[in-house]
Amino acid sequence: MATRALLAVIYASPNRCYISPSRIKIQSLTCSSSSHYYQRQSRKNHRIARSYSSDSDSSVLQPPDVARLAQTARISLTPAEIEECETKIRRVIDWFGQLQQVDVNSVEPAIRAEMDGGNLREDAPETFDNRDSIRASIPSFEDAYLKVPKILNKE
C-alpha cells in the first residue's frame, strides 16, 4: 500500500505535492510561501511548481489529499488507512524538508561511491532466440503482441 501511495504522490493531479524523480526536492503547488513560479515539464506532461519562502530557508509543504490520491490510483482505502497514510506521508515530507537544507554544492556527482563512472556496460540490444517457448506459455498472443485482460475501467 505504501508503494502505491508513493506512486500516487508522484503522479497526482495539480494542487497536490509532487516528488520529482529527477530531483531530491518535494515540489508543491499549495504552500504558504510568498513567491511561486510554475514550470511546465514537457516530458511528463504535468505541472510541477517549486515553492520558495523568503521568510525561512525551507519551504512549508502541505500534505496531499490522500482520499483523492487513492481515487486517482484506483485503490480503495478505509478512513483508518487514509489517516495512517496521511501521517506517513507527512513524515516523508518532513524528512525531505530536512534533505532540502543539506548543502551538496561541494559534493561531486557520482553513480556509486565505489565507482568512478567509467566502467559501465555498453547499452546494446540483445535478441532472444527462444521466442516459441515464451509464446507457448502465454495464454493469449496475437502477431507480435501479448493480449492481457483490461484492468482499469474508464469511468
From Swiss-Prot:
Gene of this entry: GATC
Alphabetical UniProt keywords: ATP-binding, Chloroplast, Ligase, Mitochondrion, Nucleotide-binding, Plastid, Protein biosynthesis, Transit peptide
Catalysis performed (reactions): L-glutamyl-tRNA(Gln) + L-glutamine + ATP + H2O = L-glutaminyl-tRNA(Gln) + L-glutamate + ADP + phosphate + H(+)
Species of the source: Arabidopsis thaliana (Mouse-ear cress)
Name of the featured protein: Glutamyl-tRNA(Gln) amidotransferase subunit C, chloroplastic/mitochondrial
Record Gene3D superfamilies: Glu-tRNAGln amidotransferase C subunit, N-terminal domain
Enzyme Commission identifier(s): 6.3.5.-
SS bond partners: none
Family that this chain belongs to: Belongs to the GatC family.
GO cellular component: chloroplast; glutamyl-tRNA(Gln) amidotransferase complex; mitochondrion
NCBIfam families tied to this protein: gatC (TIGR00135)
GO BP terms: glutaminyl-tRNAGln biosynthesis via transamidation; mitochondrial translation; regulation of translational fidelity
Subunit details: Subunit of the heterotrimeric GatCAB amidotransferase (AdT) complex, composed of A, B and C subunits.
GO MF annotation, one: glutaminyl-tRNA synthase (glutamine-hydrolyzing) activity
Known role: Allows the formation of correctly charged Gln-tRNA(Gln) through the transamidation of misacylated Glu-tRNA(Gln) in chloroplasts and mitochondria. The reaction takes place in the presence of glutamine and ATP through an activated gamma-phospho-Glu-tRNA(Gln).
Transit peptide: 1-52
